[in-house]
Amino acid sequence: MAAKNEWAEKDYYADLGVSSSATEAEIKKAYRKLARENHPDSHPGDAAAEERFKKVAEAYDVVGDETKRKEYDEFRSMIASGGFGGAGFPGGFRTQEGFDFDLGDIFGSGAGRGHAPQGGFGDIFGGIFNRGGGARNAARPTRGSDVETEITLEFREAAKGTTIPLQLTGDAPCHTCHGSGSRSGAPTTCTECNGTGFTSENKGAFGFSAPCTQCGGTGKMISDPCPDCSGTGTQRRTRSITVRIPAGVVDGQKVRLAGQGEAGPNGLPAGDLYVTVHVKNDRVFTRSGDDLEVTVPVSYAELALGDTISVPTLDLPVRVRIPSGTPNGRVLRVRGKGVPKRGGSAGDLLVKVEVTVPSSLDAASASALRAYVQAERDAGFDPRAGWAGK
């Protein structure tokens, strides 16, 4: 979900298609409708639908929460009333009590120590105005970096799901200090910020805070840095993991594995791993959503007289009955033999029957076929009866 420092660029009410005066029930109804229409399960492989779904979820995360919505509305009201001066907000703003703040002093646009606001309006404004400047404005890391990789699967592996080994090279927890960054494995709590990572200061009715300069915003102090990782808690190395690919993935789909990305510094959580799946074509099957399609060659006699034939599936073959008089190209449906779905069910197997004509006939077969043709004529059968081109 978006951080508060992105609220200035968002119109969450418009994203949900409601007015800013919409009730809680109206917002929830709009969210459910849009989430259902754009859910990734309904649009596998559709990146645009996935992006719309994320946008709607982000909007509802803010305006669907009473506390966040109040802060968001207050911020929009402040912007709309001209509470900030000029592009980039270089001037200042005035509270309702008429108290002037100089943004250069408050948000560190000038020289000296800057303070990122925290709490209520402080949280909102802190992210927005602490965008430029030097190292004091650097975002405090909260976890390790995400990692992206790609794999290629056979058609049937993707349809049924599989487990694959992967080797990844990147930041991993240090073996010596187990990710703490400390030789003893026990960093101490920063006495300057009492472990919060921030130091606070009050200016009138507002409270402001900034990353602690003593600990760099981590809340921890390392007096005995680990010699193998120089106190970072991470080492760059190659590691092997096993990745479970769920059944039914489609070509181009991304699978997210939480916590399998690069390790965070000084014991912070790891990032996520995103695996983009590529799927090879199959010689027998094609896919339509959760259904499998297969074309089976049959003889004219099997269609005319009816028969039972063996048809392949993702598992064992099944027996499929062809009713007598089945036309060429008819699709027969075998329920539950398609691509597995979440929850244990599966799509269907769509069997298209296609006549194969022999390229040559022996004397006995040719004689029998001629006898059949004569019998057709005697019975008055005309294959082109009712044909518009006749």
Curated annotation (Swiss-Prot):
GO CC terms, sorted: cytoplasm
Cofactor binding: number and manner: Binds 2 Zn(2+) ions per monomer.
Give the record's subunit note: Homodimer.
Q: Which PANTHER family match?
A: CHAPERONE PROTEIN DNAJ 1 (PTHR43096:SF54), DNAJ HOMOLOG 1, MITOCHONDRIAL-RELATED (PTHR43096)
Supply the domain comment: The J domain is necessary and sufficient to stimulate DnaK ATPase activity. Zinc center 1 plays an important role in the autonomous, DnaK-independent chaperone activity of DnaJ. Zinc center 2 is essential for interaction with DnaK and for DnaJ activity.
- Function in brief: Participates actively in the response to hyperosmotic and heat shock by preventing the aggregation of stress-denatured proteins and by disaggregating proteins, also in an autonomous, DnaK-independent fashion. Unfolded proteins bind initially to DnaJ; upon interaction with the DnaJ-bound protein, DnaK hydrolyzes its bound ATP, resulting in the formation of a stable complex. GrpE releases ADP from DnaK; ATP binding to DnaK triggers the release of the substrate protein, thus completing the reaction cycle.
Name the HAMAP family on file.
DnaJ
Q: Which NCBIfam families does the UniProt record give?
A: DnaJ_bact, PRK10767.1, PRK14279.1
Return the protein name. Chaperone protein DnaJ 2
Species, as recorded: Corynebacterium diphtheriae (strain ATCC 700971 / NCTC 13129 / Biotype gravis)
Gene from which this protein is expressed: dnaJ2
